[in-house]
Regions:
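Substrate-binding groove of N-acetylhexosamine-processing glycoside hydrolases
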Residues: 1-165, 175
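Disordered, acidic Ser/Thr/Pro-rich linker "stalks" and the adjacent N-terminal cap
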Residues: 162-200
């Protein structure tokens, strides 16, 4: 069951699906239970897979192919014996924002290919450049067969500048109105454009 089952007493033969992070899976295997690792940060394929402004509306989040491929489902904190209790990984897709089968294909491919390699490849044998080349080829092949994958060859990628805060030079400066604001719509008077709530 979902990792919430750890909160109410877990059945002796239960397997835990760790979706809220890795903590549930770690707790499960350290207490002798099996776990399936499916944390949202790496395995929820209903998140945006490219720059959100370039994608169909999604539930939120940003999960590009490279991040899926980088996932290691066996946390480093586990012993070799505990690691044997990790059954593997699972990809998830909630369809509130995915109205058609074609859109499902778009959201899962090629990220599901990356998740498959995460499942069957030892981390030390993985190569992102090699996989990326193969994923480009796989996307072209899927398209030829009539599927609707995300076109990896047109990936925009993350926008690092969007992750940096911007502090503009006008903040806190005196504002001089060239035309007085209307007395019928005074808002916050002279502070309406400088209080950080109403505008710049």
């Amino acid at each position: 069951g979902w990792d919430e089952i750890l909160q109410g007493g877990i059945a002796p033969n239960a397997t835990v699906m760790s979706w809220r992070g890795e903590e549930g899976g770690i707790a499960a295997v350290t207490s002798g239970h099996h776990a399936i690792m499916t944390p949202g940060a790496y395995c929820y394929l209903d998140s945006y897979q490219d720059a959100p402004y370039s994608q169909p509306e999604a539930i939120g989040g940003y999960l590009p192919l490279k991040k899926v491929y980088a996932y290691d489902p066996v946390p480093a904190s586990l012993t070799a014996e505990q690691a044997k209790l990790v059954y593997g990984v699972q990809g998830n897709l909630w369809v509130e924002y995915i109205p058609t089968p074609e859109h499902v294909e778009y959201m899962i491919y090629p990220r599901m290919l990356a998740l498959a390699e995460v499942a069957w490849s030892a981390p030390e044998r993985k190569s992102w450049p090699d996989f990326h080349t193969r994923a480009l080829s796989a996307v072209a092949d899927l398209q030829k067969k009539g599927y609707h994958p995300f076109d990896l060859s047109k990936e925009i990628g993350s926008r690092p500048e969007s992750l940096q805060s911007v502090s503009h030079l006008a903040l806190g400066k005196k504002v001089i109105y060239n035309s007085p604001y209307s007395s019928h719509y005074p808002a916050q008077g002279n502070t309406a454009l400088t209080d950080g709530i109403r505008g710049d």
